[in-house]
């Protein structure tokens, strides 16, 4: 019996699929799930991929055998096409989300598919957001795809040439989906208004409101249906039609509920960084959890933490950068969901670390001087003296080798003449910089002694 697409976009594989027109979507499922096309005739857009005899149409009609990677923007129909392929072929359907599945889950699904194949059952394996899989997770699929233990249908919003390992690319067809046109989106919205699976005309929607939904969707059918659903709920509660004003009042709520690509996404990222910088570890964990639950790319979070480690902590807590880099490496090596713990670990470490922006201000001051033209000649004794003729130019003459001094530090001019005695790095008195400040004073006193 084919297995179902869950209401949570494949969060729970192995749920039996109900028969009938709705592809397993319950009445309480989000509008975008209830309105998922149940046949090719209901698919809107992607005509370039669904022409007669095309690889994708053959798959959906049950005659294709090649694994595919569906590459396209959010809301363009990748999940829908995966479900249609399974339904049309009558094969077992297994679904994994790269956000929640690790190598263990991948191998378990493949093993179940091997057993099913012994009984003549072939399996369609759908992997949502495959670009979030680590190399190890992707490698675990190779043998099963090559020997057709599973027919892989993978979806990604990122260019697979950069996010999917080469051996998996070579074993799959790459099919690029295009954003829906305005007319495509309008057709999706109107169907949801009219169809009993959707609103079933239970609430009136002004034509101007439909226009606004199409505009806000920007080619993303799911975004349009999410906004429509929230607006319809508000309109029904107030006993009014869905107007432009209803849409405008509801769109922020819709973004918070379902959308990780709009303004709310950037607000949460900003709040996360500012909470870590502000040392509020609990708020930082809250915003981290919101990003993870919303499906934020863990690599993006790791990159932000690495930047913050130098920008807002620096030498006050030198281990912060090591922890942030280790977290990024862990994300790349093991992927999700296990890497969630590593991101939390790094977030806690950075939020509780002593803070300093002295590295940031030091580099900014040095670069401002360069832009202002303060880039004088390198002192002659510091210039390269290893080539023939260097000595005749005075290069490296009089250079003092620091290791010849018992303290490893000598009095010597290092900056150009224009920048002698300029202090760029000004450590704070916090964390590791408390000790550095005293040491730096001593170093500068030795180095800047009167030069002969």
Swiss-Prot record:
Q: Where does ATP bind?
A: 72-79
Task: Spell out the Gene3D superfamilies in the cross-references.
Answer: 1.10.8.60, 1.20.272.10, DNA polymerase III clamp loader subunits, C-terminal domain, P-loop containing nucleotide triphosphate hydrolases
Q: Which domain of life is it from?
A: Bacteria
User: What are the GO BP annotations of this UniProt entry?
Assistant: DNA synthesis involved in DNA repair; DNA-templated DNA replication
One GO term in the molecular function aspect is: ATP binding
Which keywords are on file for this protein?
ATP-binding, Nucleotide-binding
Concerning its family, UniProt says: Belongs to the AAA ATPase family. RarA/MGS1/WRNIP1 subfamily.
Q: What is this protein called?
A: Uncharacterized AAA domain-containing protein MT2636
Natural source organism: Mycobacterium tuberculosis (strain CDC 1551 / Oshkosh)
């Amino acid at each position: 019996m084919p297995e179902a697409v869950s209401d949570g976009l494949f969060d729970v594989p192995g749920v039996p699929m109900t028969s009938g027109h709705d592809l397993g979507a319950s009445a309480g499922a989000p509008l975008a799930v209830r309105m998922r096309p149940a046949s090719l005739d209901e698919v809107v857009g992607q005509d370039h991929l669904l022409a007669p005899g095309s690889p994708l149409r053959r798959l959906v009609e049950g005659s294709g055998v090649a694994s595919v990677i569906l590459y396209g923007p959010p809301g363009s129909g990748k999940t829908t096409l995966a479900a249609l392929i399974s339904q049309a072929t009558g094969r077992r359907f297994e679904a994994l989300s790269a956000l929640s599945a690790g190598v263990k889950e991948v191998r378990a699904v493949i093993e179940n598919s091997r057993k099913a194949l012994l009984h003549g059952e072939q399996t369609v394996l759908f992997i949502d957001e495959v670009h979030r899989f680590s190399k190890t997770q992707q490698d675990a699929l190779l043998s099963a795809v090559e020997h057709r233990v599973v027919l892989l249908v993978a979806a990604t919003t990122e260019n697979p040439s950069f996010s999917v390992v080469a051996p998996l690319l070579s074993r799959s067809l790459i099919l690029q989906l295009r954003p829906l046109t305005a007319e495509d989106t309008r057709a999706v919205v109107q169907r949801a208004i009219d169809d009993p699976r959707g609103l079933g005309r239970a609430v009136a929607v002004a034509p101007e409101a439909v226009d606004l939904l199409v505009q806000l969707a920007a080619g993303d059918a799911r975004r349009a249906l999410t906004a429509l659903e929230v607006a319809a709920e508000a309109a029904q509660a107030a006993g009014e039609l869905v107007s432009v004003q209803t849409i405008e009042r509801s769109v922020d709520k819709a973004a918070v509920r379902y959308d990780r690509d709009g303004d709310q996404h950037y607000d949460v990222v900003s709040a996360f960084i500012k909470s870590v910088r502000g040392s509020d570890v609990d708020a930082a964990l809250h915003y981290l959890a919101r990003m993870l639950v919303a499906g934020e790319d863990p690599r993006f979070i790791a990159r932000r933490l690495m930047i913050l480690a130098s920008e807002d902590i620096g030498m006050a807590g030198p281990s912060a950068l090591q922890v942030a880099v280790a977290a990024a490496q862990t994300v790349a090596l093991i992927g999700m969901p296990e890497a969630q713990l590593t991101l939390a670990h790094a977030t806690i470490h950075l939020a509780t670390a002593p803070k300093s922006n002295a590295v940031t201000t030091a580099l900014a001051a040095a670069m401002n001087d360069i832009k202002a033209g303060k880039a004088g000649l390198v002192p002659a004794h510091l210039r390269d003296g290893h080539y023939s003729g260097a000595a005749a130019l005075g290069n490296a003459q009089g250079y003092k080798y620091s290791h010849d001094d018992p303290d490893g530090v000598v009095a010597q001019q290092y900056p150009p003449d224009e920048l002698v005695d300029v202090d760029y790095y000004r450590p704070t008195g916090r964390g590791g910089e408390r000790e550095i400040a005293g040491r730096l004073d001593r170093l500068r006193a030795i180095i800047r002694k009167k030069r002969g």
